[in-house]
Amino acid sequence: MQSGRQKYIRNFSIVAHIDHGKSTLADRLIEATGTLTEREMDTQVLDNMDLEKERGITIKSQAVRLIYKRNTGEEYTLNLIDTPGHVDFNYEVSRSLAACEGAILVVDATQGIQAQTLANCYLALDNDLEIVPVINKIDLPSARPEEVKQEIEDVIGIEAEDAPLVSAKTGLNIKDALEAIVNKVPAPDGDEKAPLKALIFDSYYDSYKGVVCHIRVKEGAIKEGTEIKLMNTGKVYEVVEVGVFVPNYMPVDELKAGDVGYVTASIKNVRDARVGDTITEAKRSANEALSGYRPAVPMVFSGIYPVDGAKYEELKEALEKLQVNDAALSFEPETSIALGFGFRCGFLGLLHMDIIQERLEREFNLDIITTAPSVIYKITKTDGTLIELTNPTNMPSPSEIKLMEEPIVKSSIITPSDYVGAVMDLAQNRRGIFKDMQYLDTTRVSLNYEIPLNEIIYDFFDALKSRTRGYASFDYELIGYKDADLVKLDILLNADVVDALSMIVPRERAYAKGRNMAQKLKEIIPRQMFEIPIQAAVGAKIIARETIKAMRKDVLAKCYGGDISRKRKLLEKQKEGKKRMRQVGSVEVPQEAFMAVLKTEE
């Protein structure tokens, strides 16, 4: 049932492909409703991290309250929830969408529908949201709004005839977008007298307030002093403050069903207020939690080590600080013979990994070495025990393995039809299994493949972009595990295994990969005073070898003529010395070597 107050509330989010102008449109809406003064307007208000502004991407979800006055004099409260657009943060997007009744689908008038437009749009449809298409960038000379409207109708199957045509950059027709939100997005409902149910769609740590939870109240009301309980963790807290974002904090007396705002309750750690959890009253609690909660599961693992071993404690502190704000980051200590003490970290995906590494270097001034990323393999041993393997170094010997499974993703690639051959070739090289293809229009094709996650984890995206001149877009989701014939490839330097360079590869590729890595390392590792053999091995079998020749002094320079036996004696003596050096010498592996191993060519 709707109250009169709820009739004037609209909760919506904006979904789009990367760079279609989502955050810019949000800025224009904020400006058009006069939420911030000209002076306070900063480009991309909702992206607060420097890293977000620089890369032009949204990493954390944000929310802001806009007051829109129609010409008829009615006042509407619009709650805009800005979501990350990247596939790594899919779960955050789905929780932000669950807090809304409608979604604005921003489509670039020059590019049309892209892979993530589709992925995010289907995510919104899964949450039963009303979708309002908005066509952006119509100020560009290459804009083709009519074709894009047709494309939205054909591909997604939603009405786009009267979609507002806007330019978020110049602020053209922003009023039309606001009108479309009011007219098309349904008002929230929910009983204000029922027991409290509120969805946490984001939470982060504020050094003064503790953990701040962004919430959407579904039923009931919440105010200062209420004793609340988090349904999935079972913990009880007392509310210190409730309020709304304008985009800065503005405390209010209470939030009722249909409202979006924030709540603080002296929670110390983000892990206690997980995204997707349900807040209810401790004394009068709801019968069941809101559906859709799942803990964040890392998909990609990588070792992070300080370049200077003495900085281990600093790295640990830095990771702990990042974890306070990022419940999806996990880490545990590990040691490597080659790199010393460090941490095995788990991430949601490659972008997440990249961002964490960059934040460690920027915000904490740490020099770090990262090892090749790996995924979680499931191994059934011969004695029937099941293990999950995140670090290739810990792989059991082949005689103990009965079955080994690797994660598989369903990927959709949208590419201009001229490049279909190149894209198919790339997907097949990466052990992709072709599922289906459909033409979106005369020039663009959507290809669906099942590809092992291990194959797209490093440079698949770069390779895809370079083969399609940057035109292809890519989106993936994990669908399950499949058994595979995999082996552990070890690299030996001077007959010692360098554990940080070990990797898991398909058996049929082991030889080529080993050969390739040995050649790469030969170019990168500096010459020493003694000869260094570089070997690639699977188990005890050496499959490839390269040798870095020793630097040597010309010991015969002082012999002019004379007897050959004199020269031989000097050469033998040098040879003995080199042999001794080789036994005691150790080889330093430069950071470039780790990076090069990742970038082995196709």
From Swiss-Prot:
Belongs to the TRAFAC class translation factor GTPase superfamily. Classic translation factor GTPase family. LepA subfamily. GO terms for biological process: positive regulation of translation. It comes from Clostridium botulinum (strain Kyoto / Type A2). The lineage of its organism: Bacteria, Bacillati, Bacillota, Clostridia, Eubacteriales. The keyword GTP-binding applies. The keyword Cell membrane applies. This is Elongation factor 4. SMART domains: EFG_C. InterPro entries: EF-4, EFG_III/V, EFG_V-like, EFTu-like_2, G_TR_CS, LepA_C_sf, LepA_CTD, LepA_IV. It is a peripheral membrane protein. Keywords: Cell membrane, GTP-binding, Hydrolase, Membrane, Nucleotide-binding, Protein biosynthesis.
